[in-house]
Amino acid sequence: MTLAQVLPGTTLPLPEEAADNAFSVLTPIFAVSGGGLLLSQLTEMTGLSPTTIQNWVKRGWVSKPVNKKYGELQVARILLINLLRPAMQLDKIAALLSYVNGSVEDRSDDIIPEPALYNMVCAGLFAMERERTIHHEFVITLIGAQLEGYEGPVLGAKERLSDALAVMLLNIAAATLMQQADAIYEQMCPMR
């Protein structure tokens, strides 16, 4: 499995030090942007169209921007959706994220902040790439190690998070394999 050399879900270059805390790459951007990113900045960073992001907000998959700015929680959620959408239907992605963190507008029902979830997904992807495996057993072992010591705010939170991470990592791996298969196909049967 080979991931592009960009920060997952973005068009930004991937620094080597991002392996354990991928979302920290965005900290300087938030520091100079006055508490959030404008839609134009977010579209440039993700490669998504403005209407796509606005549609996700309209559908309730991402909380509304505050003063036209998207904060860290919103950006992390957008990056997660962007990562998952090549191999998963958008309504299933929304349901999966709700399974983890409940209502997008209510932080009190979250079992993990979205930036931390994004970091866990990225760390899992980097480990899968490093070990060159996408076996389900490896993914489960990896998630178990990631969640060691995690105490969720509600009963069953650790199991919910573990299940959701497995679905996310395997879907992203599937998307990567689909891209590789498409590239091979294009070499075999180029468009005429």
Write out the residue ranges for each language-model feature.
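Basic helix-turn-helix/winged-helix DNA-binding cores
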Residues: 1-101
